[in-house]
Each structure stands twice: as structure tokens, then as C-alpha cells.
């Protein structure tokens, strides 16, 4: 290499040293000083890993005094370069010797890095291109936000998330029956809103007992890192911000925290995008006296654009309570309870028409007339004719029915704000089997009852009944708090025998009181050494989590988990299928809540319900009322609260007095009323709302699309190559699992999301669902997203040189492959990525500037290429400079033409989708007042914004590869 003092060179292996200056040439050695770092390097003149830095006309360069020059002419004098051009600030014609160039110069543009000899390995160029394709594929996916969560692909859950998650500032009521997965639906919506940029700041309000469970669920299932806020956390946060809620984007807190005026004011001022309220049916409301909890949520809902309320079903709540929730979502729309009742009555015609369509049978003249009247603004005669035509294709007829159902759904009063699935409309639940185990009443309890009756005459009936349902509690109170009752209670003997007989089975035991649960654990431990753990409201959240994890362990874990009534709220243990009810709650909803701990979506076995009770006592009579009157053990009973309210007086008297005649009368009356309510509910079932909530065939197709994405071999290959390039150690763990560890040779100093001690991952959804300790990898997982960002935001793979061995082409033939990114700068919330995400534009030029990319695919071209030593690659680039410079300008012309096409297609797609949706919503607003003005104005504003962003779309060269033909 010809070296001269003062020349500027850059190190091919240590580009971070900046621009070097030749300060010594002696014999076969050359000394280069790198002024930016003050370091010297000594190189062999013949094999120095150095590249001469020479700029070209049009380049902008910077002097060591930090003024810039646009180069117009390059002069070589005495082996040194002098640049002539225009001063960027003054416009004067100036000259700059290369010795006076800025030392801190870095080559960021791919073409600059190529000519400066900063050439990457061939595999890195390939991985970079695959990363850009993956990012584009994810951004344009219709399933964005649904693929990543570690949840089962259950149709109604995915459907609700798909429908609600795509809305701007959704305000909906999720009112599925117990066990159908409202928390998962909310998590899916949150995940989708965050990933699509529709929301950034989210507040989740839950009962105090569920805060940690939500925290764990959001992280384990959705990879979302929420922060739990309590008073202590708020005080700590003052060091960072006057408003503690601004210190985190994703926050979970309890209503109790917000009861303090100061904290509520801070929450109101925190600019949330979405609020989620769990157990919203506990928010008590009446027109005269709404509760404090209701007022807190109401104040927040007036400030926060998006609101999700998770609540019990309207059937369980009663109409006024249901109206109160809807009022939180849209107070202008749901302003008067009587008007709401009247409006609901008018939906019966819509529901009747929907029943006719959903039945799949031929439509009667009455049904056709009803449909025609309801959909009077459009001509449906062709669709009706098609449905009635038995000779028509089955799929075509089904499509016609579906379209008419969709039209009816759009006109349904609460169809856009209420989602309610019931077990009647969702399949896949296990059988529930009741096993009763009557036990003889011990004498100790008989005595305790007698004494209690004499001493507690002042108590009201309700309090007396609660006492007689828990004889162990009465005995403890009279025995100075001693817990010795378990030594003679026959229910405990039965429980021990049951656990010994079923040692291999996990058993959940629920009792009303925490004291009872603790005593039972002591009994099992001291009498038989049975491994059991307790779960009650006196334990901290972390203690409860540990107890739950101990119970869940297959090997070495507890056989039994003993829960108190309050302690078990919100916890699910569907890996167990045996439930022991040590006593019974005096409330049908609480009974269902107990059974619902096991009877949930995901339960793979029948739920066996065991009920040991004391014969000829209030326990037996309550068992009979629940079983014979309500059928509440083996089926869900939505009318349970109604029946309890209607018969509570008679029930309480019957429980206190052992009167067989009264009991028979009560059972007969309850059973008759139960059948009456069941029939009324069946007839009044809102089939249209059910169709909208579970999605029908559309939900099944959605789930099938998601299932097809699972195990995508192309994705798996791309992700594994990505981890290889970054330097992540991958150890096969068997059973479709891989253990990832940071290696000593990581390309980047940190890889966010990859723990130092490693993480076990799988691409198999079923495995991830069966193992809490294994992460599910999809293209939405943070480990994949972070990996893509690390590569695409760095210079990795932006340049490469390769050899094409093909004797059909003349040796020395040159090809220049350029990867541009077509993009437009816009905030994520604008949703521009749906129409013009960063899109790779490939241009492949021969030496004459002909674009061959349409005829030669990337894959076929790449397979024929071989890597080149970096030193040789640098020489090849230098030798080809004269040919390459004009090709860059030519390539940009081709890429710009493609950009215009992409922008036009994006604009057409955006206009078609959004204007179509806008017109549809405007038309529907005339027949369905649930269409909010905010949705219409947001769509109009979004279209204007997107057009502006598309006007500013641009190209950026992302990577370049020089390819030379060789016959060697």
C-alpha cells in the first residue's frame, strides 16, 4: 500500500478509533495516530487492515474546527488530498486539506462504510435483511397483538380482543360468566392497544387481594411489566416526580389507594390512555346515593378516553346495577334508567329477527317482514332470496345469513359496548359431579348448639344461621379459642381418609373462615403428616403466591390447598379437579365462585365436588336447597341471587328449625320458581348479543389463522439465526425447548430481556401453556422485538462483499445490491404502520445500471454467493469505486419509483378502509346511538393526519452488497 505522511486512513477492525493520520513510514511498517483517542497503531505496510478515506463530489465533510464543506472537487497533490467546495454556513468557496479533517468522523451511511472498508460478514447482511422483512411482516399483520400472549387460542376470548383491541379508546363492559376468562380478554386488549400504539399509559384498578395476581398474570402471560402502586410506592416516587403516577407507564392499584383525595387528584391528572376496572360489579350505585367507589371510577372515566369494566353477568347483577356500569362508559348515552328499560324493550324485535337467522332454518313470512322493516334503509331482497334458495351453494347461503346478522348487530343497542358470553353459548366445559358425605353430629357440637341458642337469643336470624352453619366456630368460642374441635369432628376424619385414598391427586379445600383453614392444616399435618398449605386473607400477596406455587408443584408439592372464602377470591387452580367444600356459604354466588376456582376454561377433567356435612343439621338442609332447589352444584345458576332474595326469609327459618314439612315446601317452591326463571332466561336470551360476543364462525377462523402462525418454521429459523449473530448461547433442553444464555462474545453489551442466568423458551404454544417456567416465543415476544431493534438500529450488516461463482457470467462482472427502507416519520399512535410500515425495497444493478431485482429473487441470488475475506473485500471495493459511484445514483432513481408506488398503494388502502368505515359509522349512527361522536371525529382526523404523513414518505439506504463474479 502507498502510504504518505498526513494521509487519513480508518481501521477496518477498530472503526471506533475514528479517523487516523499517518505519522510514520519506516521500512515495512507504518505508524498511524488516531487523534480522537490519542492512540498509536503500528501496521505492516503490505497487510495493514486500513482503508484510505477519500470523499467524492457531493459529500459533506467536517473540519477539525467543526465547520462543514460540501465537496465540489477533489485534488491530489504530493499524495495528499485537498477538498474544494462551498462553506455550508457562509457559502464561500473554500479548500480543506485532508490532514485538517475532523478526527471523530464516523461512517454511518452504508455507502460511506463500504468505501471506508467497514465491511460486514455476509451472514450479518442476510440477517439484517431478514430482520427488516420480519418487522414489516409484523407491522402489516391483521393479527398484531394477538399472537404473542401465552394464552390458549380460545375463540370467544380472541374474538373479543380482536374486536375491541382495534378500536380507538375502547369503552366496553366485559361481562362473561365466571370461568370464561375476562382477565385474559382484558390482557389481550391491553397487549393489542400497547403494541399498536393506540395506548401507552394504562391504569388497572383491582381489589387489593388481586393486585399481585394481576401483576404476575400481565408479566407471565403478556410480557407486560406493570408496577403495583400503594401508599409507600407513591411516597418513594416523590423523588422523581411530584405526581407519582407519572413515574410509570403501566400501573396497578387498588380502589383503597384512590379513596384518598390527594391520590385521586394525582390519578386524574396523570394522562392515562386506558383504564381497566376489575370486579366492577362491587361499585354500588343508585340515583340518589352512588357509593364512594362508584364516584371515584366515574371521575376517572370522565378523564380517561378508554375504559374496560370487568363485571359479573347482567343476569346476576339485576338491571339497575347493569345500567350503572353502562352509565360509566357513556353517561350521555345512558342518562336515564327508565329510558334505558324502554329502549331495551324495543330490541326484542331485533333479537327475534336474529334468532330466525341464527337458527339456520327457512325464514317465515313474519321473519322476512321483520327483517325488511328493521333493515329498511337497504335492499335485502337478494340476500333473502339467496337464503331461501335450497338449490344455492351452502357456503353462499351461510354468507348471506352472516351479512344480515352483521347488519342487525350494528343496530343492536348495546352490541358495541357489552360483551357477555355464557356457558350455554361457549362449549368445552367439564362435567360437574356432586358427591355428598353425610356425617354424624358429635355430642360436643350438640352441647355447643344448645348453649349458643340460650346465650345468643338477641342475635338476628341471619347471624344465628351463620353460627349454626359453622359449629366448629361456636365450639371454639366456648372453648376459650381452642382449636381442638378437629380432634372429634367427623368431617376431619373423612377428609383425612379421602386424602390418604387419593394421594396422587391435588385437592382444593375451601372453608368459610381463615381460622377453620388453619385448624384443618394443623389436623392434616399432626395427625397424618399430609402435605398441605393454607391460603387466607391474613397472608401477604407473596405468601399466597408461594402457597399457590407449592400446591401447583407436581413433584414434592402440597397435596392439598386449604383456602378461606376471601383468600380464594380471584385465584384459579384448574390443574386440580377435586374440590372439597368443608362448609357452605350462605350465598349462591359465593358457592359458584368456589366451584369456579376449578370449573374454568382450561380444565381438562370433570370437576368432582365433595361435600362432607353434618346430618340432620342446617348444613344438610342448605345442601338440599342448593342441590334440589337450584341445581347449583352440578350446573351454574345465573338466577341464584334472584332465588336467594325471593326465598331468603323462608330459607333462614328452615335452616334454624328442623321442620321437614317446611323444607319440602321450600324445595318445591324454589324448584318451580327455578324452572320458571330458567325458561324465562332461555326465552329472553339475547342470541344476537351472544353471537356478537363469541363471534361464531368468524371467531373460529380467527383462531385458525392464529394457530397457522404458531410453529412457523420460517420464523423459527430467522429468530435462531438472529440469536446466533447477536451471540446468544442456545442449549437444546429437549421437548421443543431451548435455554438461552448471554455468551462471552455478545455483539452488544446488553440484551434487554435476556436474564444473566438465562431463560428457557419454546416456539410450541401447548408446551408454554403447560409449563409456567417456559416462555412462548413468537415474533411479538420482547426477546424477538429487542433482537430486531438491536440489529436494525445498529450498523450491523449494512455492508457486505460476496463472490458469485457462475461460469455462465464473465469473470469480474459486478453487481450492486442495495436495500432501501421506504418509510414515513409518524407517531406510533397514528397507525401509519398499517399502511406504510418500514418496507424493504431491493434494487439489484449490473455494471450498466440495469435493475435485475424483478428477475432475480433475493433467495435465489443469495444461495449462489460465497463470503470474502474482509481485507480482500476492501481491495475489491477500492478497485471498483469508479464503477460503483454512478450506480448509487441510478439505484436511487429505481427505489424512488418504487416508493411512489408504495405510497400510492398505502394512500389508496388507507382511504378505502377509513372512509368506508367512516361512512358506515355515520349511517349507523342514525339507527344506533351507541356510535360515539369521538369515534367519528377520530376517524376524520386520522385520515387527514395520515395523508400528511404519507406526503413526507422517504427512502433511506439501509444496506449495500457488492458482488463480483469469479471462476476460481
From Swiss-Prot:
Highest taxon above the source species: Bacteria
This protein's encoding gene: rapA
Originating species: Shewanella halifaxensis (strain HAW-EB4)
Pfam families named in the record: Helicase_C, RapA_C, SNF2-rel_dom, Tudor_1_RapA, Tudor_RapA
GO biological process: regulation of DNA-templated transcription
NCBIfam families: PRK04914.1
Assembly and interaction partners: Interacts with the RNAP. Has a higher affinity for the core RNAP than for the holoenzyme. Its ATPase activity is stimulated by binding to RNAP.
Protein name: RNA polymerase-associated protein RapA
Protein family membership: Belongs to the SNF2/RAD54 helicase family. RapA subfamily.
